[in-house]
C-alpha cells in the first residue's frame, strides 16, 4: 500500500451514507424519467451485488493483505447503504422495488460465470500478482459509478435525487482512491 491512501483515516471516517435530512417523502412531487429509473435500478443492483463480488473476492489471494481486508469490511457496508438509499428514493417516487431482486439476478448466473469465478480464485493462488486484476476491476467499477452518479445528478430535474447522488459519489471517490493507490 502506498502512503497516499491513509487506511486508518478511511476506517475512522467510514459510515453509511447520511440521508436523514433528505425528504424522500417529497421525491414523488418531482418525477423522474424512464431513463433515470432504468439507470437508478441498474445502479441499485450494482450496489446491492457488492456482497456477491465480495464473496468471490474472499476466495482469492486478494484478501491476504490486512489493509485490503480492513478496506473491504467498510466498503461492503458503505455500498449496501448506497443501494438502500437508491431503493428508498425509488420507492418514494412510487416505483415498487422487489425485495428479492438481488437474489433473483444472482440466480440467473451462468455456468460460465461460476466457472470463471472459481478459476480466478485458483489462478490467484498460483500467480502472485493476479490480485491486481481484482483491484484494477474494482478501480474501474468505482470510477465509472462515480462518473455515472455525477452525470445523473447534473441532468436530473428531481431535487432530492440531485442531493442524494453527490453523497454517493463522495464515497465512490474514496473507494476509487483506495484501489488506485493500491495499484501504484
Question: Which residues does each PLM region occupy?
Answer:
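Non-heme di-metal
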Residues: 1-184
Amino acid at each position: 500500500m502506498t502512503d497516499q491512501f491513509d487506511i486508518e483515516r478511511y476506517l475512522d471516517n467510514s459510515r453509511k451514507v447520511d440521508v436523514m435530512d433528505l425528504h424522500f417523502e417529497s421525491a414523488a412531487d418531482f418525477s423522474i424519467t424512464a431513463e433515470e429509473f432504468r439507470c437508478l435500478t441498474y445502479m441499485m443492483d450494482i450496489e446491492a451485488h457488492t456482497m456477491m463480488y465480495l464473496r468471490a473476492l474472499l476466495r482469492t489471494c486478494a484478501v491476504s493483505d490486512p489493509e485490503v481486508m480492513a478496506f473491504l469490511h467498510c466498503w461492503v457496508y458503505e455500498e449496501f447503504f448506497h443501494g438502500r438509499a437508491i431503493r428508498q428514493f425509488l420507492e418514494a417516487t412510487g416505483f415498487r422495488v422487489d425485495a428479492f431482486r438481488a437474489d433473483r439476478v444472482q440466480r440467473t448466473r451462468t455456468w460460465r460465470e461460476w466457472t470463471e469465478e472459481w478459476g480466478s480464485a485458483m489462478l490467484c493462488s498460483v500467480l502472485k500478482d493476479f490480485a491486481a486484476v481484482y483491484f484494477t476491476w474494482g478501480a474501474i467499477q468505482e470510477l465509472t459509478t462515480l462518473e455515472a452518479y455525477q452525470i445523473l445528478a447534473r441532468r436530473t430535474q428531481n431535487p432530492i435525487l440531485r442531493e442524494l447522488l453527490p453523497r454517493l459519489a463522495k464515497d465512490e471517490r474514496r473507494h476509487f482512491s483506495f484501489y488506485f493507490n493500491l495499484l501504484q
